[in-house]
Amino acid sequence: MDQKLLTDFRSELLDSRFGAKAISTIAESKRFPLHEMRDDVAFQIINDELYLDGNARQNLATFCQTWDDENVHKLMDLSINKNWIDKEEYPQSAAIDLRCVNMVADLWHAPAPKNGQAVGTNTIGSSEACMLGGMAMKWRWRKRMEAAGKPTDKPNLVCGPVQICWHKFARYWDVELREIPMRPGQLFMDPKRMIEACDENTIGVVPTFGVTYTGNYEFPQPLHDALDKFQADTGIDIDMHIDAASGGFLAPFVAPDIVWDFRLPRVKSISASGHKFGLAPLGCGWVIWRDEEALPQELVFNVDYLGGQIGTFAINFSRPAGQVIAQYYEFLRLGREGYTKVQNASYQVAAYLADEIAKLGPYEFICTGRPDEGIPAVCFKLKEGEDPGYTLYDLSERLRLRGWQVPAFTLGGEATDIVVMRIMCRRGFEMDFAELLLEDYKASLKYLSDHPKLQGIAQQNSFKHT
């Protein structure tokens, strides 16, 4: 063998990863790489780059879970090569999926299914779940209008301040979005303004059970009752879809007396994120329909796939089964008792933060993390007319220097002059961690007080997460 080749081969085998030739070059970013490299070197390059990401546990902007126990990691690893859509090849994974649908339907008080299987599906997240719920609303409305001999070219959807997925739905499926705007003193959809926006072309009303801007619940029952009166007055029957991305896995455990789900007859479908307060890893959502009549069969496809026949009503197709299996693990592991304990712990942290932050500045609280008002979030603004010598953007920027990602942002609609700060409390953000946040909060306030000339420059660099 050529001596140079032998030397190169020996080096490739024996060099440490930090002595390897490949690690002394800049990782390719614009062209497909020409040559291979050792697996440990490729891993080291990527692993090192990921250190530049923020610390997920300190991300108090996200609604998504940032802590999973080791058994979830094991189950995800076991399922990484199982395709969720291949029901025939992975029948037990498919059975677990159906069990989860039944469990979620039971949690949300869906009527007992005629054939023993609840109507619903797992999704990649609550956004896909919203899309599916919206599609079913449009199809049901169109069928009613066609039966009455009326035009179907101008559908509209009525909602309050919603997550961007509903704007996408409206654009993709050619539906007019009648979003009731936020305004000072009225940050949610109220019955009066909702009714003013409704007509016979309204495919449905979508309350958000856990508004992303503030964390408060947009309570469905008053809206539902107003729609009952609207039907009595006009004869127009309007369905509801509940976007319970966050609240769907909270209220059943910590505020069961809130009537928001299928106990309301107009509620035909509900969507939620498994990977938010459902405690599943990222990539899990759920949508449940009241019954088979609520899901138009035109949306259900029976397709041949790798030798099998499956019925599917999802937008995404191939994806790993691990998220569903991990969700089932959480359901089995915790049950109602365990979920109640975990969610109550998050609310206790939120209440503690709200009480302590109230002592530190001239703040007006929009959400204090109480189970009867919303999700475990703390949202506040500076009191009108008060000038503490800093903005919430300044405070957000200072906290970020310590690794805390706490968003400051303006509200939407007619309330864009209101700047708020929002802190999300989730599993894994325990009381001791909250105390560390408060220490850094106080240190940030002291710095801003000592350096007034540096204030006011943070707004352009601040981030939001709504």
From Swiss-Prot:
**Could you tell me the Gene Ontology terms of the biological process aspect for this record?**
glutamate catabolic process
Cysteine pairings via disulfide bonds: none
Q: What class of enzyme is it?
A: lyase
Q: Name one GO cellular component term.
A: cytosol
Please provide an example of a Pfam family that matches this protein in its UniProt record: Pyridoxal_deC
Q: Which GO molecular function annotation, any one, does this entry have?
A: glutamate decarboxylase activity
Signal peptide (from-to): none
Q: Does the keyword Lyase apply?
A: yes
* PROSITE patterns, sorted: DDC_GAD_HDC_YDC (PS00392)
Record EC number: 4.1.1.15
Binding-site residues, pyridoxal 5'-phosphate? S126, S127, T212, H275
* Description of what induces expression: By acidic conditions. Expression is regulated by a complex system involving RpoS, cAMP, CRP, EvgAS, H-NS, GadE, GadW and GadX. The level of involvement for each regulator varies depending upon the growth phase and the medium.
The entry marks the following residues as binding substrate, namely T62, N83
Please list the reactions this protein catalyses. Answer: L-glutamate + H(+) = 4-aminobutanoate + CO2
Q: Does the keyword Lyase apply?
A: yes
**Residues recorded with modification N6-(pyridoxal phosphate)lysine:** K276
Key words, A-Z: Decarboxylase, Lyase, Pyridoxal phosphate
Instruction: Please name the InterPro entries in this protein's record.
Output: Glutamate_decarboxylase (IPR010107), PyrdxlP-dep_de-COase (IPR002129), PyrdxlP-dep_Trfase (IPR015424), PyrdxlP-dep_Trfase_major (IPR015421), Pyridoxal-P_BS (IPR021115)
Family listed: Belongs to the group II decarboxylase family.
Function recorded in the entry: Converts glutamate to gamma-aminobutyrate (GABA), consuming one intracellular proton in the reaction. The gad system helps to maintain a near-neutral intracellular pH when cells are exposed to extremely acidic conditions. The ability to survive transit through the acidic conditions of the stomach is essential for successful colonization of the mammalian host by commensal and pathogenic bacteria.
Describe the protein's quaternary organization and the partners it interacts with: Homohexamer.
Q: What is this protein called?
A: Glutamate decarboxylase alpha
Species whose genome carries this gene: Escherichia coli O157:H7
